[in-house]
Amino acid sequence: MSTITVVIPTYNEDKNIAECIISCRDIADRILLLDNMSTDQTKEIAESLGAEVFQTERSYKERMAMLGGEIPIDTDWILYMDADERLTPESAKELKVLCDEHADADVNGIVCRYRQRFLGKDLNYGDSVGRKLRVFKPGRAYMEDMELDEHIVLRSGR
């Protein structure tokens, strides 16, 4: 059975963080917030739901680079989520199965489908459905060096 650390970068996400954590905690062995010194209740809410909170004033990319170094990761996989994202129960189960199936393979990342929502409703036009690399093995991926819309990129494997 493979293990998963969920990593959620945050800054003032007290309106979103509880639902995000609740949506992924059934498959998470560890939930870690990389918080950019939130001034709202993000930290307290996350901790009350069992998440570890690491606060720093470092940039987004620098916080992601801390994984495996200053912040040890001893699980098989990392699931990266934004605080305004949710896993459905079905997608959580599917993700866990995929992680278990590929734990010992040369598969270093899993591309996830996502659906755009607005005001609580699915969008059904344009780029409403997409795919992003969101699950990867520790040390096998990095965050692009971009100002906006950065992506996770695999270092090796598939």
Stretches found by the model and what they are:
Residues 3-5, 30:
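Cell-envelope/extracellular polymer assembly enzymes that use nucleotide-activated donors
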Residues 23, 35-44:
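A conserved acidic beta->alpha catalytic loop
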Residues 8-27:
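Short, well-formed alpha-helical segments that are part of the catalytic scaffolds
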Residues 4, 51-52, 107:
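Short, conserved active-site loop motifs that form the nucleotide-linked donor/cofactor pocket
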Residues 61-68, 75-81, 88-158:
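Catalytic-site signature of metal-activated, phosphate-bearing donor transferases
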Residues 29, 43-74:
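Conserved donor nucleotide-binding strand/loop of the catalytic core
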Residues 56, 81-83:
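Catalytic metal- and UDP-sugar-binding loop of GT-A-like glycosyltransferases, i.e.
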Residues 3, 10, 14, 38-41:
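Conserved SAM-binding loop
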